């Protein structure tokens, strides 16, 4: 990733138009943050694409635009039904750049606060134990029958969708292209879908 960003910045500083392509949304567990971080470290001035930075050395100015995409949590949620209608937290289980101790703290806090929890990067060939540990942490605060949505390769031809219980999460087939949606205490499985109510039925009369 670092090599890609540095190559793109070098081309852009040479006067060329350059794009860095990420899957999903470039600002969610993707490359946009690294671009900003690299520019800050190198002291490169960043401005919006249609601005005119007067009084600045143009060789040290990059016109940068972040184009939004559809993140995996939005695509996966749409395929499952409506699991993110209420408050939620997204947590990556990859400890390559974040210490596992910090990830555990975030899992504990999100589970204790009854957020719907969206897990990115749940498992890889070299990281095969983190999802099981996350399940153990969340089970301290959630019923074992809490619905869990499993979406692999969302919106692609080979996509796969499944809904299991939190108790059986460790048996689910997941990989780095899978997003895991762990329901809150109010989330439900209805037919082949999963949803989290916003609370309308408690405040308003909805006739059966």
Model-derived regions: residue spans:
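Glycine-rich beta-strand-to-loop/alpha-helix junction loops that act as flexible
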Residues: 22-25
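Short phosphate-binding loop-to-helix
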Residues: 1-16, 27
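Class I SAM-dependent methyltransferase SAM-binding "motif I" and its flanking Rossmann-like core
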Residues: 6, 28-113
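Alpha-helical scaffold segments in soluble metabolic enzymes
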Residues: 7-10, 34, 75, 79, ...
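A contiguous loop/helix-start segment that scaffolds small-molecule binding in enzyme catalytic cores
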Residues: 17-18, 112-208
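Short, solvent-exposed polar/charged micro-motifs at secondary-structure junctions
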Residues: 6-7, 75-77, 157-164
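Short beta->alpha junction loops
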Residues: 1, 93-95, 153
């Amino acid at each position: 990733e670092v090599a890609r960003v540095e190559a793109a910045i070098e081309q852009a500083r040479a006067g060329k138009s350059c794009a860095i392509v990420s899957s999903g949304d470039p600002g969610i567990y993707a490359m946009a943050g690294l671009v900003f971080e690299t520019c800050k470290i190198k002291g490169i001035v960043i401005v919006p694409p249609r601005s005119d930075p007067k009084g600045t050395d143009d060789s040290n100015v990059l016109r940068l635009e972040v184009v939004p995409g559809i993140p995996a949590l939005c695509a996966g949620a749409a395929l499952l039904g409506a699991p993110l209608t209420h408050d939620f937290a997204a947590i990556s289980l990859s400890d390559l750049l974040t210490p596992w101790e910090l990830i555990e703290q975030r899992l504990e806090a999100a589970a204790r606060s009854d957020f719907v929890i969206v897990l990115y990067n749940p498992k890889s060939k070299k990281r095969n134990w983190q999802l099981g540990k996350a399940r153990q942490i969340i089970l301290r605060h959630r019923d074992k029958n809490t619905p869990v949505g499993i979406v692999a390769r969302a919106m692609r031809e080979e996509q796969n969708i499944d809904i299991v219980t939190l108790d059986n999460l460790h048996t689910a087939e997941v990989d780095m292209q899978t997003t895991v949606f762990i329901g809150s205490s109010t989330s439900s499985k209805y037919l082949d879908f999963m949803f989290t109510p916003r609370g309308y039925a408690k405040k308003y009369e909805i006739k059966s």
